Regions:
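N-terminal cationic and glycine-rich segments that engage phosphates or anionic surfaces
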Residues: 1-122, 127-137, 199, 230-233, ...
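Positively charged, low-complexity, intrinsically disordered RNA-binding extensions
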Residues: 137-256
Length: 256
């Protein structure tokens, strides 16, 4: 089954994508710093800084992000986390997490992207209340000793884990996320990324080229938007159809 990073990965090499990575990490750090600006006593801030450094964000950008929350940077506006929910073609449910310092810029952009590709922007809770679960997801480097890992993970409140290439993805209930992550850290497992995420309860199969193409373009536009941090969806598209979509996009300019 196709997964969202297929689209996001196409933009990694561009200068524009690098600028967005810096921008999003800066906002994540600013949000995390609201609780406390010292990463030694603010685990969320420490995680945000670690993630930013892993993606190549420079120290001066990180320092400015912390100063932004503290009010030292007087030219900066407050960063907000806003979720937008709706549907893509084919009845595919979509949740977009945006980090913005200007609602008047972000909201019209989200409405445009949904409508331009045959989707509909809904009200808060219109899909998150029934189409998704909300819980923890922790990615670690696949350990050499899987037997030991299984023994450790069974002693935690983790829900499940799956192998994805050289990574292990552990899922948890929202209330158990912190304790499971702490147990993995104490056991010296290398955490690649972690956070609270939406997970589809059921997937919506898309078998036709036209809706699959519009979903592709919609997600591509979300990826390009400077305020969009994460997109979750319920699309179930075969690898064969997804490859056909990618080939079509590569050969022709899509028009909405």
């Amino acid at each position: 089954m196709w997964r969202w990073p297929t689209v996001a990965g196409q933009k990694e090499a561009s200068a524009k994508a690098k600028s967005k990575i810096y921008n999003i990490h800066s906002k994540l750090i600013t949000l995390a710093a609201e609780k406390w600006s010292d990463p030694s006593i603010n685990a969320a801030l420490a995680d945000a800084i670690h993630s930013a450094k892993r993606d190549g964000v420079t120290s001066d950008v990180i320092e400015r992000a912390v100063k932004r929350w503290a009010g030292i940077d007087k030219d900066s506006s407050k960063v907000e986390e806003i979720f937008y929910e709706g549907y893509a073609p084919g009845g595919v449910a979509i949740i977009v997490r945006a980090l913005t310092d200007n609602r008047n810029r972000t909201a019209p952009s989200m409405r445009h992207i949904f409508s331009a590709f045959g989707g509909n922007l809904g009200e808060t809770g219109s899909v998150s209340n029934f189409a998704f679960d909300y819980g923890g997801e922790i990615h670690i480097k696949k350990p050499a000793d899987m037997d030991m890992f299984e023994m450790i993970i069974l002693d935690t409140n983790a829900e499940n884990y799956i192998e994805e290439g050289e990574e292990i993805v552990i899922t948890t209930a929202r209330e158990n996320y912190a304790s499971v992550k702490s147990a993995l850290e104490k056991s010296d497992y290398e955490i690649i990324s972690s956070g609270l995420w939406y997970r589809a309860k059921n997937y919506t199969e898309v078998t036709e080229m036209e809706p699959a193409l519009k979903i592709y373009k919609m997600l591509e536009e979300f990826a390009a938007d400077e305020d969009v941090e994460t997109v979750w969806n319920t699309a179930d598209i075969s690898d064969t159809l997804w490859k056909e979509v990618e080939q079509f996009v590569a050969s022709k300019k899509f028009r909405t």
